[in-house]
Design a protein with these regions (language model features):
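N-terminal beta-strand motif that seeds the catalytic metal site of vicinal oxygen chelate
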Residues: 1-15, 72-77
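Short, charged/polar surface micro-motifs in flexible loops or helix N-caps
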Residues: 47-51, 60, 82-85
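Exposed loop/turn and edge beta-strand positions of beta-sandwich/beta-sheet ligand-binding modules
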Residues: 38, 71, 109
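Mid-chain, well-packed structural core segment of small domains
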Residues: 68, 74-89
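Vicinal oxygen chelate
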Residues: 31, 45, 89-127
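Core segments of cupin and vicinal oxygen chelate
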Residues: 9-51
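A short, acidic/glycine-rich surface segment
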Residues: 29-30, 54, 59-64, 101
Length: 127
């Protein structure tokens, strides 16, 4: 069994799509638009076969997102090496994204950093 896909509602669909393509190597489909409901989505595919669906529909409330809350905490992406974690973290920080931890080795042995990226949602970058 595998999780397929992960889905994320966002307000700025194009900015989110660009983020995942630029920083994490996602490939995007052409998108879907339901003219009746104005629902829009893209499926973003990654080299290992994982897919992320990013979605938008009009007038969605965007409530504050506390870093520590119930529900999903973050989406983690493995970039393959400590050096790549370091390099991507530096790039994201220089492009204005908030780094909230790392890069570091966690108590359970993961080498990672965590950023606040997409509309207050956390992205973890790991080996």
């Amino acid at each position: 069994m595998k999780i397929e896909p992960i889905a994320l509602y966002v307000n700025d669909l194009e900015k989110t799509r660009s983020f995942f393509m630029k920083y994490l190597g996602a490939k995007s489909n052409e998108g879907y638009h339901n003219l009746k409901t104005n629902f829009r989505s893209y499926f973003l595919s990654f080299d290992d076969g994982a897919r992320l669906e990013i979605m938008n529909k009009p007038e969605m409330p965007d409530l504050p997102k506390e870093l520590a809350r119930t529900g999903y905490a973050h989406i983690a992406f493995s970039v393959g090496s400590k050096e790549k974690v370091d390099d991507l973290t530096v790039e994201l920080k220089s492009d204005g994204y908030e780094v909230i931890s790392g890069p570091r080795t966690t108590g359970d042995g993961y080498y990672e950093s965590c950023i606040v990226a997409i509309e207050g949602n956390q992205i973890e970058i790991t080996v």
